[in-house]
């Protein structure tokens, strides 16, 4: 409509040029924008329709040290700045890098407002702590609060207080106000900037920067003289080789200008444009800027590279250690500052494995007299000839042999060569990423339509690759201008290309040093690292399988091992398939995988075998080395109760023999229940590896992988858009997460992290709504990431436990504290000595020393045995398993013992853990006294004894503590009470003093509202010494009930009197009276002394005095007072009444008794 103009204001990221300056007259941080950029981002401010504070958030590009958006105040636009430019003035963390700063671009976004910070934590050194711990108001003024609008950023170093901003809440960046809580903490090391002062402290900042810059320039020209003799090294410069984790973009102009000479007049140069935008980026290498001077070249130069194994005095040699003398590469300098290592050359993994993964290489500049500064403009074609014809063969693998994937990987191969002028050499491997899901979808769609392969689409979306189709250059021909390099340029318009034949070779090994899978976008798999701990190593099962794979594919082994491995686990989602995939990549082995449920045909065994052969025969015949992996193998052959042979299992055994007869073939199968597998098939596997639930250290490594993987996948920033990405907040502790997630599987840990991200998004949205700020501004305030906090992860873990605890059997930590246990101080000290020592100092038990992990509580009922066991789990942050006797019994033979094994296996999976056997006398009575004909109870006791022996060992059982409780220890099997099992017996009796009784009531009534007149000591003095802890619990509960009844009666009387004053139709209900009339006194329940007296008079003790005497006699029998006889050889008898333990030993016909005195010394007659 006329008179209305539409504006398109840009608020998303804009790529701009960045310069950094320092103002000696004004030390405040600020940003200046060029006029055009200011009008683009702040059009409403530029035309005067809006005024006030303007802010931008900028992420500097090219350096890993600046991977987050930082917010700055924007001053007026500067007309002197070049177009599309940002001037960052006095940015302290950048200026400290001085001459090492080469970042010149970044993404800029508009920020409308920042939130006020609630909390700021500042770390300072101990020597300045007293100075920094000033009043709250002074700290706010120093940091720039109170309407100064100074942006406080987490991670910045503040020179005014010599401290580092360690944490900001609720966002990483914001403004201070008078209500902001500032916390100053002491830190021994702050990782402060290194260029604030010189090492000896004698130079100021400007002199230090000037000296470093002059030294760098003089050092470069001393090594890079224009004298041809000094310009070129004869043997090359050695560098260690490292591989890049992901591709690095290099800024390339479409036309590069170089200098050439006219053939008629060589003295008159002319400019020649050469296109280098489409050259092969796989020949790009990177190093730190300081390393270029050692080589004698500039960033972007073409240099020669050869293996460092050669020790010849000349670079261009012809020795046997260098079959290929050298290769041409283009060297680039990393953007400074960076965290890359000095003395290293960084190659892409594809170039590295095609060079056989050299550890050391030598670089040498190209010798072209009088043209030293022209090499940046040279194309590879100046040194590498054009190939006339090239032949490429498929590498035989499960991917290239799959017809459903053929169309896609051939299309991707064509796209690969059309994207630029590639440089190849003979026997070079070419990786082509493939999205298998996309390829199979296209194939199935067009196959249903009856379309030929030739009519399949030629333009296919890129997709997300999850597999690699390998190709190998078998033949390349052309004029070798430089026979030493054996490199050829492939021009899709001039080079004749042929794809024919299939070759057999192993894929490159994928390792942390050369992670080509992650570089090609297939994702980074968990590597199952074998990290040595105090007592055990992590992922021992991965170490075992890794050894088996390497031994099977070892070409030097003359005997075919015919290796077969069964992977089993008691829980699902442990990571069996991931383990096989990861180790296949790591060891450089082809992998073919089938699912037992997919190939199973219940109606026909022959069809099942036919389907398996159709999927495996061709692959096994053409691929080597190879892992044949069948998951869910229990679907094919389950154990049968009938005593007959499983014909399908026999046929599968024949298949296994046939496949493993070929050298280099490994057969691996996985199952969730190995006991349910057919006996015939299970016996075929030579190795059986059991995967357990991750330990605490293993969970730490898994959490680290999950969180680091998110951080390594840097969000993609483009003009106007930015992908949402997540990152952990600085105070997230991996060790705390792993401790809270005991007993959970790797898939549960993945779910926890994903759910924490969802909770973080919800939290940021609610914060944005509360502060009236847009969601995008909240994200920019946290560095461009959504930061998930420890609270988010803790909520996610609790949600996972509550949702899946029944299905996965994950135990929960009870919420019983020491304050809930009254008295029993001596017992608490004994428990601390038994459990606290192995938990805090496990290294003391690493050499096989037996640890005391069994505790037996015995005594009258109601004395707090179960409560004390739960307090142990809570106090030491241990998981808690409670086992009742009847749940272990099963009518089938052998199942009861299996239940005992499963209990202890779950405890080992969830360690640190407490296994609590309540009423132990019903679970493990004396053997031989039971009336059951099958001897079930005897076998349960025997199994329990064997498991307890495993718990007390120095290996495997660490972190598992067994606690038993019984009222009748005299009924227990005597073998349970020997050292190494329940070797710590603690008697829990009734309180023998009124002081102890008072402590019990204090613990039970600590959440009560007691009347000021209540004195628990007086209440305790009126109680007999026959009251147990359960009796006192009943006493306090009845007292609370009496108080509630009294208050309720009083309220009823008040309501009755209130209604008497009202007409009958207007009388009110109890609910209305509480909502409108009731006072605080009517709601507050105060327990008075009369309530306790009434409860005590009505209470009947649960244990009589006679019964207590009986328990005391039982205690006397177990802890001392019972005389032991020792028969010596001379017939004399000695008596020992010190309560020592005696072990009877028989030598032939003569009985000898071994006695153990109080000091642990052995006395043998």
From Swiss-Prot:
Record-listed E.C. numbers: 3.6.4.-
Q: Name one GO biological process term.
A: protein import into peroxisome matrix
Question: PROSITE patterns annotated for this entry?
Answer: AAA (PS00674)
One MF term in GO for this entry? ATP hydrolysis activity
Q: Which SUPFAM superfamilies is this protein grouped with? A: P-loop containing nucleoside triphosphate hydrolases
- Provide the topology term for how it sits in the membrane: Peripheral membrane protein
Which keywords accompany this UniProt record?
ATP-binding, Hydrolase, Membrane, Nucleotide-binding, Peroxisome biogenesis
Q: Which GO terms describe its cellular component?
A: cytosol; peroxisomal membrane
Please give the knockout or disruption phenotype noted for this protein. Leads to a peroxisomal-deficient phenotype with the absence of peroxisomes and the accumulation of aberrant peroxisomal structures resembling 'membranous ghosts'.
What family name appears in the similarity comment? Belongs to the AAA ATPase family.
Q: What is this protein called?
A: Peroxisomal ATPase PEX6
**Annotated gene:** PEX6
């Amino acid at each position: 409509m006329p008179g209305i103009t539409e504006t398109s204001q840009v608020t998303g990221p804009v790529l701009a040029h960045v310069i950094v300056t320092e103002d000696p007259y004004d030390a405040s941080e600020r940003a200046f924008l060029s006029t055009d950029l200011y009008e683009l981002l702040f059009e409403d401010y530029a035309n005067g329709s809006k005024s006030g504070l303007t802010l931008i958030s900028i992420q500097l590009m090219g350096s890993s040290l600046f991977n987050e958006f930082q917010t700055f105040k924007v001053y007026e636009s500067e007309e002197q700045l070049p177009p599309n430019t940002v001037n960052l003035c006095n940015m302290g963390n950048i200026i400290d890098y001085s001459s090492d700063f080469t970042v010149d671009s970044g993404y800029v976004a508009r920020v409308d407002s920042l939130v006020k910070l609630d909390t700021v934590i500042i770390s300072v050194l101990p020597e300045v702590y007293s100075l920094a711990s000033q009043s709250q108001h002074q700290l706010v003024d120093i940091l720039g609060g109170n309407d100064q609008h100074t942006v406080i950023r987490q991670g910045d170093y503040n020179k005014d207080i010599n401290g580092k901003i360690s944490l900001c809440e609720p966002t990483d960046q914001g403004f201070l106000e008078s209500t902001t809580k500032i916390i100053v903490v002491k830190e021994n090391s702050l990782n402060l900037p290194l260029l604030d002062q010189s090492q000896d402290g004698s130079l100021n900042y400007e002199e230090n920067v000037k000296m470093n810059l002059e030294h760098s320039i003089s050092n470069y020209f001393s090594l890079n003289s224009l004298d041809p003799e000094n310009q070129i090294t004869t043997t090359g410069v050695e560098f260690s080789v490292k591989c890049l984790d992901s591709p690095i973009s290099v800024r390339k102009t479409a036309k590069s200008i170089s200098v050439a000479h006219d053939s008629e007049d060589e003295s008159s140069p002319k400019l020649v444009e050469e296109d280098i935008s489409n050259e092969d980026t796989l020949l790009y290498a990177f190093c730190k800027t300081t390393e270029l001077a050692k080589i004698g070249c500039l960033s972007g130069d073409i240099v020669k590279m050869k293996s460092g194994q050669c020790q010849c005095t000349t670079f261009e040699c012809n020795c046997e250690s260098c079959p290929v003398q050298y290769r041409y590469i283009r060297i680039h300098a990393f953007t400074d500052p960076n965290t890359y290592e000095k003395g290293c050359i960084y190659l892409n993994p594809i170039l590295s494995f095609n060079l056989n993964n050299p550890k050391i290489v030598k670089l040498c500049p190209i010798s072209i007299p009088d043209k030293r500064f022209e090499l940046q403009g040279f194309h590879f074609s100046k040194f590498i000839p054009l190939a006339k014809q090239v032949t490429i063969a498929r590498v035989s693998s499960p991917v290239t042999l799959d017809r459903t994937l053929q169309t896609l990987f051939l299309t991707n191969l064509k796209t690969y060569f059309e994207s630029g002028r590639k440089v190849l050499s003979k026997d070079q491997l070419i990786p082509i990423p493939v999205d298998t899901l996309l390829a199979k979808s296209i194939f199935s769609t067009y196959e249903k339509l009856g379309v030929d392969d030739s009519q399949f689409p030629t333009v296919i979306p890129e997709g997300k690759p999850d597999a690699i189709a390998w190709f190998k250059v078998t033949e390349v021909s052309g004029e070798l201008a430089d026979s030493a390099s054996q490199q050829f340029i492939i021009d899709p318009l001039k080079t004749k290309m042929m794809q024919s034949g299939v070759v057999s070779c192993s894929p490159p090994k994928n390792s942390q040093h050369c992670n080509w899978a992650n570089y090609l976008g297939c994702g980074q798999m968990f590597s199952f690292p074998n990290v040595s701990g105090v007592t055990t190593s992590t992922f021992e099962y991965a170490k075992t399988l890794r050894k088996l794979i390497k031994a099977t594919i070892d070409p030097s082994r003359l005997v075919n091992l015919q290796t077969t491995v069964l992977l089993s686990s008691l829980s699902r989602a442990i990571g069996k398939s991931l383990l096989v995939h990861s180790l296949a990549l790591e060891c450089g082995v082809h992998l073919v995988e089938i699912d037992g449920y997919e190939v199973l045909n219940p109606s026909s065994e022959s069809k099942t075998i036919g389907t398996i052969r159709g999927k495996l025969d061709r692959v096994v015949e053409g691929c080597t080395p190879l892992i044949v992996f069948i998951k869910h193998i229990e679907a094919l052959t389950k154990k049968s109760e009938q005593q007959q042979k499983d014909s399908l299992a026999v046929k599968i055994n024949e298949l296994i023999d046939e496949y493993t007869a070929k050298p280099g073939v490994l057969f691996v199968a996985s199952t969730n229940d190995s006991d349910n597998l057919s006996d015939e098939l299970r016996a075929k596997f030579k190795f059986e590896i059991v995967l357990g639930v991750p330990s605490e250290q293993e969970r730490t490594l898994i959490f680290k992988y999950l969180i680091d993987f998110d951080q390594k996948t840097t969000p993609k920033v483009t003009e106007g858009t930015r992908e949402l990405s997540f990152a952990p907040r600085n105070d997230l502790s991996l060790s705390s997460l792993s401790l809270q997630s005991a007993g959970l599987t790797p898939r549960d840990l993945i779910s926890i992290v994903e759910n924490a991200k969802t909770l973080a998004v919800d939290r940021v949205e609610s914060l944005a709504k509360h502060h009236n700020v847009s969601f995008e501004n909240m994200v920019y305030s946290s560095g461009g990431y959504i930061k998930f906090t420890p609270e988010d992860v803790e909520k996610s873990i609790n949600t996972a436990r509550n949702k899946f605890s029944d299905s996965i059997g994950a135990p929960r930590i009870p919420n019983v504290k020491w304050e809930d246990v009254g008295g029993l101080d001596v017992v608490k000290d004994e428990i601390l000595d038994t459990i606290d020592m192995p938990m805090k100092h496990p290294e003391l038990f690493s050499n096989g020393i037996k640890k005391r992990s069994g505790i037996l509580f015995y005594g009258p009922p109601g004395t707090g045995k179960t409560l004390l066991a739960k307090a142990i789990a809570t106090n030491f942050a241990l998981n808690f398993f409670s086992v009742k006797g009847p749940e272990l019994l099963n009518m089938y033979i052998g199942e009861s013992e299996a239940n005992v094994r499963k209990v202890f296996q779950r405890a080992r999976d969830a360690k640190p853990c407490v296994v609590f056997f309540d009423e132990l006398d019903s679970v493990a009575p004396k053997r031989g006294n039971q009336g059951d004909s099958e001897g079930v109870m005897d076998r349960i006791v025997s199994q329990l004894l064997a498991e307890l022996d495993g718990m007390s060992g120095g290996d495997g059982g660490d972190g598992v503590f067994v606690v038993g409780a019984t009222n009748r220890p005299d009924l227990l099997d005597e073998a349970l009470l020997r050292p190494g099992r329940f070797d710590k017996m603690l008697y829990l009796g009734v309180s023998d003093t009124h002081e102890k009784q008072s402590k019990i009531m204090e613990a039970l009534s600590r959440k009560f509202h007691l009347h000021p007149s209540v004195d628990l000591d007086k209440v305790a003095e009126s109680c007999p010494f026959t009251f147990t802890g359960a009796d006192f619990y009943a006493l306090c509960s009845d007292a609370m009930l009496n108080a509630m009844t009294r208050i309720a009666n009083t309220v009823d009387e008040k309501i009755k009197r209130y209604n008497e004053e009202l007409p009958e139709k207007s009388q009110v209900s109890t609910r209305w009276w509480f909502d409108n009339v009731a006072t605080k006194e009517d709601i507050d329940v105060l327990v008075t002394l009369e309530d306790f007296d009434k409860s005590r008079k009505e209470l009947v003790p649960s244990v009589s005095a006679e019964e207590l005497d009986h328990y005391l006699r039982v205690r006397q029998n177990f802890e001392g007072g019972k005389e032991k006889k020792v028969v010596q050889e001379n017939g004399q008898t000695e008596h020992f009444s010190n309560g020592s333990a005696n072990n009877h030993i028989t030598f032939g016909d003569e009985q000898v008794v071994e006695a153990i005195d109080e000091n642990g010394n052995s006395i043998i007659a």
